[in-house]
């Protein structure tokens, strides 16, 4: 079972979303004023996401991979394919924010992407390998940034302006969030 950083407010007792299968580690909530230690912890979480995801799906059968993690939710296979889709977007957002002046980024419809045939027909190992390669590059980029670089901003058309500290925290949480969908399903099903 994956472990999660206690830095996420959603991990605190009393979070009403902790019993919601959609948010097994709670909702994302950025912490106050990130420190170098917080950034390093987030980078380590991102760096380790591919290995934790690979462990989370190890040994699952085709039928198990096609099982939704909750009623009305994505299948385990769709969750696996979603992670590189989403994290590719995050990686590009980091690059835009570092190379352009407060760019407006393009959102994508994650549900529509998850419903495309590649999420159904592609073996999960393809996305696991893609995520490993992506995170190897992304981690190099993240570790190369100076503290002031994390103040670079971008605008999301739906949620407004954000800095790279916020994006770093979000994607540190995001990988753990989806891995917990899989590990909590395995626990509930006795897999």
What kind of feature is each model-predicted range?
Residues 28-44:
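Short, charged, low-complexity loops and linkers
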Residues 34-38, 76, 113-127, 157-166:
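Acidic/His metal-coordination segments adjacent to aromatic residues that form catalytic metal sites
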Residues 46-74:
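A glycine-rich, hydrophobic loop/mini-helix early in the fold
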Residues 41-56, 114-151:
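Acidic/histidine-rich alpha-helical segments that form the ligand environment
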Residues 2-4, 8-25, 29-30, 66-111, ...:
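Short, contiguous alpha-helical
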Residues 38, 45, 71, 75, ...:
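Alpha-helix N-cap/loop-to-helix boundary motif
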């Amino acid at each position: 079972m994956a472990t999660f950083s206690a830095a996420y407010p959603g991990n605190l007792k009393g979070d009403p979303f902790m019993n919601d299968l959609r948010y097994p580690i709670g909702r994302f909530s950025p912490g106050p004023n990130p420190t170098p230690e917080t950034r390093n912890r987030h980078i380590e979480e991102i760096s380790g996401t591919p290995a934790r995801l690979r462990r989370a799906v190890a040994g699952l059968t085709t039928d198990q991979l096609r099982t939704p993690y909750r009623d009305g939710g994505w299948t385990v296979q769709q969750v696996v394919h979603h992670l590189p889709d989403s994290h590719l977007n995050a990686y590009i957002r980091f690059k835009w924010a570092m190379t352009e002046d407060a760019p407006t980024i393009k959102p994508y419809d994650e549900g529509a992407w998850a419903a495309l045939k590649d999420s159904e027909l592609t073996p999960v190992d393809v996305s696991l390998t893609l995520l490993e390669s992506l995170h190897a590059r992304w981690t190099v980029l993240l570790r190369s940034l100076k503290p002031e670089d994390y103040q670079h901003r971008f605008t999301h058309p739906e949620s407004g302006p954000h800095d790279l500290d916020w994006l770093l925290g979000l994607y540190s949480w995001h990988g753990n969030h989806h891995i917990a969908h899989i590990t909590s399903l395995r626990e509930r099903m006795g897999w």
